[in-house]
Design a protein with these regions (language model features):
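N-terminal beta-loop-helix "entrance" segment that forms/cooperates
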Residues: 47-65
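Donor/substrate-binding cores of folate-linked one-carbon enzymes
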Residues: 33, 89-203
Length: 309
């Protein structure tokens, strides 16, 4: 294990920030608003996006430019800057890459990780907690070390996951709570990291095919997938995204998986166990719409099965 640079003692006022996606932006903004001197920002390289494949900066890079903070793509460059004009701490929020051991030997870092470590180490902790049916999750301020999300924990906040809680709900709450924890740690001085205890689980990235609804699963499991965002099925060979749905039956097994029942304005779909009601869907190449509006146009028959091709 790499020997880590010692965490600073007392209030932390000068930091470097490492982050990339939109969820990291409010943390960077909060640091600046709170009077923390963000000396430098490191983010992932610009990516080609859109039909024109034009290079596009990350949301964090755009934010740093707007705030007038020097921004680059190289942790090595950050290390060189740190040697010439030291910062107290590196703050990592969804940077998207592991920080190399030799950097951590010179520059101590903490990370906002959106799970209750050691459960759900890895790239998709929010998504995996929701899919697994966890009753609660949380956010940790942890020391960055060589391993993936293995460092000691400085502070934790918890939140329940309800039957209607979406991944976006969790993300918004945990980033807000994590930001509060981070600012408190910087103002009051960093806590002593506590080693993680318990059996770790790995939060692998969500693969596209995992978002396909398997109607043989239980209604509760299907609901969790829909609340993740991006869930889809097929109808008459075309893709049908399911943006919102609710569980209406958790016990019956007599409905065929994927079977369609239209009752007034209620579009009910059978599952392996139970059933769900579609609320908002999006047919292929069309806008999002109320499920009843979709049914009025598509007129799904009682002999049809979603997901059948």
């Amino acid at each position: 294990m790499t020997s880590l640079a010692t965490l600073p003692v007392g209030p932390v006022r000068r930091v470097a920030f490492l982050g990339t996606p939109a969820l990291a932006v409010p943390v960077l903004e909060a640091l600046v608003h709170d009077g923390v001197d963000v000396a430098h920002v490191v983010t992932r390289a610009d990516k080609r996006r859109g039909r024109g494949s034009e290079l596009s900066p990350s949301p964090v890079k755009e934010c740093a430019r707007r705030l007038g903070i020097p921004v680059g793509h190289s942790v090595e460059e950050l290390l060189d800057l740190h040697r010439r004009a030291p910062v107290d701490l590196g703050v990592v929020v969804a940077y998207g890459a592991l920080v190399k051991p030799h950097v951590l030997r010179e520059l101590p870092m903490v990370n906002i990780h959106v799970s209750l470590l050691p459960r759900w180490r890895g790239a998709a902790p929010i998504e995996r907690a929701l899919l697994a049916g966890d009753s609660e999750t949380g956010v940790c301020i942890m020391q960055v070390e060589e391993g993936l999300d293995t460092g000691g924990v400085l502070a934790t906040a918890r939140m329940p996951i309800g039957r209607d809680t979406t991944a976006d709900d969790i993300r918004s709450r945990l980033i807000a709570d994590g930001t509060t924890l981070l600012l408190r740690q910087l103002r009051d001085g960093l806590s002593v990291p506590v080693p993680q205890e318990g059996e770790p689980t790995h939060a692998a990235k969500i693969e596209p095919d995992e978002l396909r609804i398997d109607w043989s699963r239980s209604a509760e499991e299907i609901s969790r997938l829909v609340r993740l965002g991006g869930a889809f099925t097929t109808h008459r060979g075309g893709r049908l995204k399911v943006h919102r749905a609710e569980v209406i039956d958790t016990e019956s097994t007599h409905r065929g998986p994927g079977s369609v029942r239209v009752a007034r304005d209620s579009i009910e779909i059978g599952a392996g166990i139970g059933a769900i009601r579609l609320i908002e869907v999006q047919p292929e190449n069309k806008a999002r719409m109320n499920a009843s509006a979709w049914a009025n146009g598509a007129k799904p028959g009682s002999d049809e099965v979603l997901g059948g091709g």
